Amino acid sequence: MYNKVILIGRLVAKPELNKTLTDKQVVRFTLAVNRRFKTTGEREVDFINAVAWGGLAETLASYASKGSLLSLDGELRTRKYDKAGQTHFATEVLCHSFQLLESRAQRAIRENNAANDLIDLALEEEKLPF
């Protein structure tokens, strides 16, 4: 039997590096992945939770940011945990490797465009009569 996941998508938020009680580095993050098909003229998006450990977690937290385009290679995992006396199950991708798919220059352009969009939105709101 074989369990392999390959995803290409954008990070929903900047990955934050954390440490476990046993001092292991971990990053939990969400990847926005477009579906192949369109139902209403626009692609639907799946938000897939993933986790990276150790040096891989440190590298991801250091070099990736919100909106970064990356490919991820890993395996699907399920886990069970208890929260307030209730048993919960989670499914996530355990990341074995990743690759950033945009250069620093491309990332700077994307971030600059996002900042300009926010400025334009603020200017439009100033024109509102109320």
Describe each region flagged by the PLM.
Residues 8-11, 31, 66-77, 95-98:
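OB-fold and OB-like beta-barrel modules that bind single-stranded nucleic acids
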Residues 80-92, 96-104:
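C-terminal structural segments of small proteins and small subunits
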Residues 4-45, 89:
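Core FKBP-type peptidyl-prolyl cis-trans isomerase
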Residues 53-88:
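Beta-rich strand-turn-strand
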Residues 4, 28-30, 49, 59, ...:
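Residue-level recognition of specific faces of alpha-helices
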Residues 1-2, 22, 40-43, 86, ...:
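Acidic, gly/ser/pro-rich intrinsically disordered tails
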Residues 43-54:
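Disulfide-stabilized netrin-like
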Residues 12, 16-18, 53, 77-79, ...:
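Conserved positions in beta-strands of structured domains
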